[in-house]
Each structure stands twice: as structure tokens, then as C-alpha cells.
A protein has these predicted regions:
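A conserved beta-strand-loop-helix scaffold within acyl/acetyltransferase catalytic domains
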Residues: 46-99, 103-124, 191-346
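Acyl-donor-binding surface of acyltransferase catalytic domains
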Residues: 1-5, 13-41, 145, 163-257
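Short, flexible segments with low predicted structural confidence
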Residues: 34-36, 270-273, 334, 350-352, ...
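Active-site/acyl-donor-binding loops of N-acyltransferases
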Residues: 29-44, 110-111, 153, 198, ...
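Contiguous N-terminal and early-domain "leader" segments and peripheral loops that mark the onset or edge
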Residues: 18-56, 101-155, 308
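Acyl-donor binding region in acyl/amide transferases
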Residues: 90-91, 113-212, 332-392
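Low-complexity, flexible helical/coil segments
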Residues: 86-88, 128-133, 142-145, 228-232, ...
Length: 429
């Protein structure tokens, strides 16, 4: 498997002048748009440059002016990531300048998959396979321009006056510089990837800097759009067909006896050990992991994001048996990590109930959509989420391997086969 969702560099920040290109995630009503803007001849003539930052305290004062439409590029989120990233992840922060003006910001993550056990408890046999050998030798050190902990385009935010092709070219040069920095530390990068973009946005990468990159897609991002007529959870239930109303009622009946509570900072800190146990119970049973969260991750997120980060505990007989986390990103609700006791999960349909609870939270609080992310595609579609294809770009550092990357990728990352469900009534029902 090639990990496409993709911390400890101490080198000084480097400034490199380059031509550059820019793209922007801009929050407008209910959707993310990709904008091209015309710039004056005077602005286009100014040199574009990039600067790589190792620490958030180095970021320019105007950083958050560009990040205001995406919490996952805000300084407070990046501070949390800097303080509580997975042990095998190295983050850098990139500013793109037109002259002295900051016109784009970006996040990069280096993942060293050789330093962790990527395969879950049920997949130990894969350690001996040819596939694992090829993965370890040729695709285990990855530089991601984006955020491997999330689904969607959280790589970059750009000023409305910047030129997209110039910003993208600057980011390409920043990626090259990062690879050189790691190489000087004895780390040869295998893969470089820009993630995740909608299919309509990939055309912006048609430029020489990306001509040798593989365009790829893996599991889709599952997104539930909240209909305007849904003013309550009951409205959502009423929109379902009989089969899925029955599924909803059955799951709620199974969950009787479970109490739910949103935990504050002190409660999250007090429950760190149990939260980690429940999280690892889920993660270790996944077929593949690119990282594992540290125990203090949720505590730090709550410290930094405050009310924008929500951790809801599920209790039975006053014992924590599961939890879910969510992050408020403007009018979009992003689901984050969760954990549960698998034996209780099966009996109480805990995971399905968590999905319903997140949907109810989004409806009650006026969100336009929920980002459910990848994995568990079929069950997420059964509560109304629809697949959105995300496209990434990938390039291998070996000029010999790179032309064969499509074959290599398809072998290590086979297409996921699943059946999409539609829980809502059709016009004929």
C-alpha cells in the first residue's frame, strides 16, 4: 500500500527566490472554490519567493489573515500540530511572498513509515510479503504538501491577488528544497505528493514543474450535505426511506444505557490514558496506518482550538467506552479521530450511533456539510454521505522508478470495491 494520507527538523529556515504560483481554498456559503485572479502588470513583475519555517513562532504576523477561511492552516491549529504531532511526522510551514507581501501559506509533512508498525494486528503476515518489501524499500519516506491527518484540500491558502501558477511553482521549489534539507540529514525521500484536490482543480497543475507527476485517486472523501429543510434530527429521519428509518431506530434502541457527554479540557486531560487505549484499539485493527497519535494529542488540540474542538465521550456504567472528535471549520464540520471498545461497539452499534450523533450535531448547529473522510465508505453512505473523488499528484525521486509509478501504485494501492447506499426517499417512494 502506498500511503497517500499522509516531525524533527532543526535546520534554520531558508529563503529561496523563485517564480511562483498560487491557489486558494476560500470559504463561500456552502462550498470550497478554486479561484484564478488577474493581477496587475506591476504585481506580476514582482519576484515571488518562498520561505520555509520549522516552528510556528517564526510565522509572519500576517499568516492568519490568509488562514482565516480554513482553521487547519491557522496558527493555533499548527501550534497544536507542532506540539502534538505523531512521532514519525515532521512538519514545516511555508510562506510564499510577492516581493515583501505574504500571498500564500502552506503546510508540509514528512512521514517516515519505517519508524512505526504500519500493519494492524490482523495483518502481521504482510510483514513477510513482497508487497511489504517493496513498500518499505521504495515508498516509506514521503513528503506531503498537505495534511495527512485530514481529508480534503488543506495544503494551502492564497491571497485573492496572487497568481496561481506562480504560487504552485513556488511550492514545487519549496518541496525540492525540503527534500534537499532532509537529504543533508541522511534521509532520502521516496515520494513527494500534493494532496487532496477536486478533479476540477487538477488542471491548475498543468505546468512544467508537475509534468512528470502521477495523477491518482484512492478512496473518496465521504461528505454529507445538510439540506436546508432539515431543521431538526427528526426532519433528517423523515427524509429516509422505510428501510433506513428502521436501521436508525434499531441502532438507537441498541444504544440504550449509554450516556454521552462533551468533555472539557480538564476532563480530556484526566482521561488521556483511556482515550489512548480506545483510539489504539481502533487504529491497531485498521489494515494500515501511516502514523499513531501521541497520548496528549487531544489535550493539546483542546488547549489550542478551545470550543472549535469537540470530544464527546460515550459512557456505560460511568465507564468511558468510546469517544468521537469533531472540529468546527467555518460552516463545515470535520470529523476527526475516534475510539471505542470493539466488543461493546458490536453490541451497541456504537460506530453507527456516532455517525448519527455527528449528523444531528451538524443539523442543530447550522453547519452546511459534514466531512466524514475516507474509510468505512459503505456505512457512511448508509447515513447519507456521498463520495467526492479527491485527486493527488505524486512523484518518485528515482528517475528510473517514476515512469513505472502507475503500475507500482496500482499494485500497492488496489482499487477499493464497495457498494454505495442511498438512505433517502426517492420521488417514487
Amino acid at each position: 500500500m502506498i500511503p497517500v494520507l499522509l516531525r524533527d527538523a532543526e535546520q534554520s529556515a531558508a529563503l529561496s527566490v523563485c517564480t511562483s504560483y498560487t491557489f486558494r481554498k476560500h470559504k463561500m456559503t456552502k462550498q470550497t472554490k478554486w479561484f484564478n485572479f488577474e493581477c496587475s502588470t506591476e504585481k506580476l513583475s514582482l519576484p515571488y519567493s518562498h520561505q520555509i519555517y520549522c516552528h510556528t513562532h517564526e510565522l509572519p504576523l500576517t499568516w492568519d489573515l490568509l488562514a482565516n477561511s480554513n482553521i487547519f492552516l491557522s496558527k493555533k491549529y499548527l501550534e497544536a500540530l507542532e506540539k502534538a504531532a505523531p512521532s514519525n511526522m515532521t512538519c514545516h510551514f511555508i510562506g510564499v511572498f510577492r516581493g515583501n507581501e505574504l500571498v500564500a501559506i502552506a503546510l508540509s509533512q514528512f512521514l517516515d513509515l519505517n519508524s512505526i508498525d504500519c500493519y494492524g494486528n490482523k495483518n502481521q503476515v504482510k510483514h513477510l510479503s513482497l508487497k511489504n518489501y517493496l513498500f518499505r524499500k521504495y515508498s516509506s519516506r514521503i513528503l506531503v504538501m498537505g495534511n495527512s491527518m485530514l481529508s480534503g484540500q488543506n495544503a494551502c491558502a492564497v491571497s485573492g491577488t496572487a497568481n496561481i501558477p506562480q504560487v504552485l511553482h513556488a511550492l514545487s521549489l519549496a518541496a525540492d528544497e525540503l527534500k534537499a534539507i532532509f537529504k543533508n540529514k541522511g534521509i532520502d525521500m521516496h515520494l513527494t505528493s500534493f494532496k487532496d484536490f477536486q478533479a476540477t482543480e487538477v488542471g491548475d497543475f498543468k505546468m512544467p514543474a508537475f509534468k512528470d507527476d502521477l495523477r491518482f485517486s484512492v478512496q473518496p472523501n465521504m461528505v454529507l450535505s445538510i439540506r436546508e429543510e432539515w431543521k431538526s434530527e427528526q426532519d433528517y429521519i423523515n427524509a429516509m426511506s422505510k428501510k433506513y428509518r428502521t436501521q436508525f431506530k434499531r441502532s438507537r434502541t441498541k444504544a440504550k444505557g449509554i450516556e454521552k457527554k462533551e468533555l472539557g479540557l480538564d476532563e480530556i486531560r484526566a482521561q488521556e490514558n483511556k482515550l489512548q487505549e480506545l483510539y489504539l484499539h481502533v487504529a491497531s485493527n485498521a489494515p494500515f496506518n501511516t502514523f499513531y497519535l501521541p497520548k496528549h494529542h487531544f489535550t493539546v488540540l483542546k488547549e489550542k482550538l478551545q470550543s472549535a474542538f469537540m470530544l464527546v465521550g460515550y459512557f456505560m456504567d460511568e465507564q468511558l467506552i468510546g469517544f468521537k472528535t469533531m472540529i468546527s471549520n467555518g460552516d463545515v464540520l470535520d470529523t476527526y479521530f475516534l475510539g471505542y471498545d470493539d466488543t461493546i461497539q458490536k453490541e451497541k452499534m456504537l460506530y453507527l450511533n456516532m455517525l448519527y450523533d455527528m449528523t444531528a450535531h451538524a443539523i442543530h448547529n447550522g453547519y452546511s456539510k459534514i466531512i466524514f473522510g475516507r474509510t468505512a465508505l459503505e456505512i457512511k453512505s448508509s447515513i447519507g454521505a456521498k463520495p467526492e473523488e479527491m485527486v493527488g499528484l505524486m512523484k518518485h525521486s528515482s528517475k528510473i522508478i517514476n515512469p513505472f509509478l502507475p503500475l507500482f501504485f496500482n499494485y500497492l494501492e488496489p482499487k477499493t470495491v464497495w457498494q454505495e447506499r442511498n438512505p433517502f426517499q426517492t420521488s417514487s417512494q
